[in-house]
A protein has these predicted regions:
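Adenosyl-5′-phosphate
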Residues: 1-4, 23-27, 42, 72, ...
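Cysteine-centered catalytic environments shared across enzyme families
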Residues: 1-345, 350, 363, 521-522, ...
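Phosphate/ATP-binding catalytic cores across multiple sugar-kinase/actin-like superfamilies
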Residues: 243-265, 369-373, 377, 470, ...
């Protein structure tokens, strides 16, 4: 993985005078790409790259240039293609030759050959930009599921783009201004974001499954959707569906093991990470190599953990079961409060926004521990969104309730906001508008029963909102340590197929992700295969709640704290007084009282560190 950035415009003088800005933008990408840096400045274009070398370490340098049939193409690219051999063969048949075996070179030739039509041919996770020197156009594209980020804005009669928000903010033409709508995104929806919203004024994010063309002579930006979830007839019976799922999942995992650097897997002892680890283990064992697996836990969690309906049991027994089952070398990573609290702020630096509190911070530290052992890791994200694993898919009360199922607390959130901070924005209407817009974008084939229509809506809501929040988290926290994390369940072929699968198949035998479990029968030990879903682990140690409470009291006692300009101090006092007993989660299943307190710490830090101008 890497980081990309750039600016293209009508007037070459604008580009030539911004070299210092490009150096600053490149520096913001140093953690994403610690291995090599490159910059292309010519005429009206500047393309910037910071590389994390994973494939073809010698020949994959960027920006990469190709002269083909009278045009000069320059590429900067962040991601991995998982069908590189097929693309290379198709291009070779059309007369293309290659200097190395990198997917970067294949992607560049693919664009030169097929133009925008190359994007649907790609299976992978990517965000890339191609400058066509003679045509004076910039092409931007993002993968179907939104695994890799790409932000942009129009300023100085030009287009400025980058992998992260901080990259754009390093440019003098992009001030850290946040208007009422942007602030409402943070306070009412965060850590989620409206698809395409960059929070900062005039900053947008290219949507998953979208590409854009910017014409420098007219300053015109045109957006195109090349992929979306579409509902189709599903003729397969359950047995055929299970076979297809097994083939798709196995192929997706095996394709994502390609690397010229060490590869590891996350292992929680849950269904998704265990499946990935088993298939990866077989792959490496067949090659005479040993897989490395990593698990995260917290000091004294065995002492303080108590089961809930969301977290029915601890991970450790199942991790040990998998350790015995695999041929891998396993690493236990144990986190503690003194490490977690400072990481709350590093997590904001990584995400450029308040995030998921210690759910972010713990992942950041976990990835930091993995990096000395591996450059690439595979993780089980997105299986729950696609196979229907979350409680809100299965609990009819929650499923049929109006609104985002992971964020039923708009009134509670609004109770913290000082009057007038959001201008004339009505919190309930703001959230409702986005919910209704997503429902309206849901593909439902004619004649589908109402219950199945609702399940299509649920998958679309989760795919466009909740999954994007988790993918943001995974990308920013891992890349902050220069670790590339791949997510096999985000293979678009799996999402396409599963979207139209009847709910009775997905919920086979009334078990969450029953279809996936049945499809992979015999691959895992039964205790792991049929284990109830348990989410990403968090600390239960009361020392963490005490530590973040102390930090928030320090903020409350600071009259200059930016948090207090927008948040009611009395509401924060009430939150602190509730201890661990507040039943209202801030977001999802995991962000209860300790995480909500930590989120306000992140909000205060973000306002100060990023010098946010509220306009």
């Amino acid at each position: 993985m890497c980081g990309i950035a750039g600016q293209v415009g009508r007037d070459p003088r604008t580009i030539q005078r911004r070299y210092a800005a490009y150096c600053a933008m490149q520096q913001t990408l140093a953690r994403r790409g610690p291995d090599q840096r490159g910059m292309y400045i010519c005429g009206a274009a500047a393309l910037i790259h910071a590389r994390l070398a994973v494939v073809d370490l010698e020949n994959g340098l960027q920006p990469m240039q190709l002269d083909w049939q009278g045009e000069t193409y320059v590429l900067v690219y962040n991601g991995e293609l998982y069908n590189t051999p097929e693309l290379r063969a198709a291009l070779a048949a059309r007369g293309h030759s290659f200097n190395g075996h990198s997917d970067t070179e294949v992607l560049l030739h693919a664009f030169a050959e097929w133009g925008a039509n190359c994007v649907p041919r790609c299976n992978g996770i990517f965000a890339f930009a191609v400058w066509q020197q003679n045509a004076g156009t910039l092409f931007l594209a993002r993968d179907r599921c939104g695994v890799k980020p790409l932000f942009y804005t129009q300023a100085e009669d030009s287009l400025i783009f980058g992998s992260e928000l901080k990259t754009l903010l390093a440019h003098p033409a992009v001030p850290p201004r946040v208007d009422a709508n942007g602030l409402a995104e943070v306070l009412l929806l965060g850590p989620g974001r409206t698809p395409g919203c960059g929070v900062f004024q005039n900053v947008r994010e290219l949507l998953p499954g979208q590409y854009a063309v910017y014409e420098t002579q007219t300053a015109r930006l045109t957006l195109h959707t090349y992929w979306r979830l579409e509902d189709h007839d599903h003729p397969d019976d359950f047995a055929a569906t299970a076979r297809r799922v097994r083939d798709l999942v196995t192929d997706a995992i095996e394709r994502q093991l390609v690397s010229d650097v060490p590869v590891a897997t996350f292992l929680s002892g849950g269904l998704d990470s265990s499946l990935i680890s088993v298939i990866a283990d077989a792959h490496f064992t067949a090659q005479g190599n040993q897989l490395q697996t990593f698990s995260v836990g917290y000091r004294d969690n065995k002492k303080y953990f108590h089961a809930t309906k969301f977290q029915p049991g601890a991970d450790a027994p199942y991790i040990r079961k998998m350790n015995d089952f695999l041929h891998a070398r396993h690493h236990w990573v144990t986190l503690d409060t003194p490490e977690l609290v400072p990481a709350l702020y590093a997590a904001v630096d990584a995400r450029d926004l308040p995030g998921m509190a210690d759910v972010d911070a713990s992942l950041l530290v976990f990835c930091r521990h993995i990096k000395p052992h591996a450059t690439v890791a595979l993780s089980g994200e997105c299986a729950d969104e696609i196979f229907g694993g979350y409680p809100w898919y299965r609990d009819p009360t929650v499923r049929e309730r109006y609104g985002f199922p992971w964020a039923q607390s708009t009134a509670y959130r609004a109770s913290f906001i000082k009057p007038g901070v959001l201008g004339g924005i009505d919190p309930a209407a703001f959230v409702d508008e986005r919910y209704r817009a997503t429902l309206a974008q849901t593909s439902v084939r004619p004649g589908l029963p109402a219950a199945e229509q609702r399940m299509r809506q649920m998958m679309n809501l989760n795919f466009k909102w909740f999954m994007q929040t988790l993918l943001d988290r995974k990308d920013r926290m891992s890349m902050y340590s220069g670790l590339e994390v791949r997510v096999p369940f985000c293979d678009y072929r799996i999402a396409e197929y599963l979207y139209s699968v009847p709910w009775e198949f997905k919920d086979y035998h009334g078990q969450e992700k029953g279809l996936l479990r049945e499809a992979m029968r015999g691959v895992l030990p039964d205790e792991v295969l049929w284990r109830r879903k348990s989410p990403y682990p968090k600390t239960w140690n009361p020392s963490y709640l005490a530590a973040v409470s102390t930090e928030l009291r320090t903020v409350l006692n600071d009259p200059a704290a930016p948090l207090l300009r927008i948040i009611r101090a009395d509401a924060l006092e009430t939150l602190l007084a509730s201890g661990a007993d507040n039943p209202i989660p801030w977001y999802g299943q995991l962000m209860t009282t300790p995480q909500t307190i930590a989120w306000f710490l992140q909000l205060n830090y973000w306002l100060a560190k990023y010098k946010v101008e509220l306009v």
